């Protein structure tokens, strides 16, 4: 995968580790799943930090900060249009390009439109204090 392809809104496969799993002492994601690259923080030496949000078919509880993915966006991101899917925005994984044990050398699956994804990122930034992350950086 070209490192330049890892930009805000692109969808990749990643062994996402849920916060609840990390709190129980797990260190590895149980399966590779689609995740959205939310933010790419530019760092020296090409070791940029990615903030990754999970995509799931499990309906989130009402108290979660999540957004259902519309059919048009599922098509753009090349996700299964026959499933109801949500992007979870109150938790995330962080990983570092160039030092990751988890990023696969595959091109992104697809990409969300700016019209759909950027308002979600603005809301994430506004709610950042109430979110939880798992640092996958090594």
Label each residue range with its predicted role.
Residues 12, 50, 67, 86-87:
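A broad, low-specificity signal marking well-ordered, structured residues that form hydrophobic/aromatic
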Residues 4, 69-138:
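C-terminal terminal-subdomain/extension
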Residues 24-32, 38-75:
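Compact nucleic-acid interaction/catalytic patches
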């Amino acid at each position: 995968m070209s490192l330049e392809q890892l930009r805000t809104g692109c969808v990749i496969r990643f062994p996402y580790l849920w916060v609840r799993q990390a709190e129980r002492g797990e260190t590895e994601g149980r399966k590779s799943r689609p995740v959205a690259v939310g933010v790419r923080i530019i760092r020296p030496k090409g070791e940029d930090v990615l903030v990754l949000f999970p995509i799931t078919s499990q309906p989130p509880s009402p108290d979660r900060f999540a957004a259902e993915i519309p059919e048009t966006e599922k098509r753009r991101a090349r996700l299964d249009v026959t499933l109801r899917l949500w992007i979870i925005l109150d938790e995330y994984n962080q990983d570092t390009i160039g030092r990751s044990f988890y990023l696969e050398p595959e091109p992104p699956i697809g990409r969300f439109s700016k019209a759909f994804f950027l308002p979600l990122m603005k809301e994430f930034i506004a709610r950042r204090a109430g979110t939880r992350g798992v640092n996958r950086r090594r």
